[in-house]
């Protein structure tokens, strides 16, 4: 993780699952610029390990607390991997960030699932 914690990539029953845990582009505006730039590079380095990997189901942070840089981690993830289904996480109940992201990135509408409430159930 670029913060604290772990991320998981596993294969089960011929499917690949990725759970980012706390691996994200943690670009906090109150941190020094050198720290923020380092976080971007660390995140890219970790995500590049999965370059072009076909991932069937992914769980990736889309954290509104990051404000204007909230999209950065998911953008980098989508550019470097080939996920089939992505569930944004770390939304802190502010699920409208998913719609906002998709309005900015319509090319991902088929892959990123809309979450409307906690406990929502999906069939994949």
Tell me the role of every PLM-derived stretch:
Residues 1-54, 119-124:
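Core dinuclear metal-dependent hydrolase active-site scaffold
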Residues 1-2, 65-67:
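Active-site glycine- and acidic-residue-rich loops that bind
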Residues 18-22, 35-38, 57-65, 84-92, ...:
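Active-site neighborhood of phospho(di)ester-bond hydrolases with catalytic His/Asp-centered motifs
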Residues 29, 68-70:
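Active-site-adjacent loop/helix micro-motif of nuclease/hydrolase catalytic cores
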Residues 49, 70-124:
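Binuclear metal-ion centers of metallo-dependent hydrolases, dominated by the metallo-beta-lactamase
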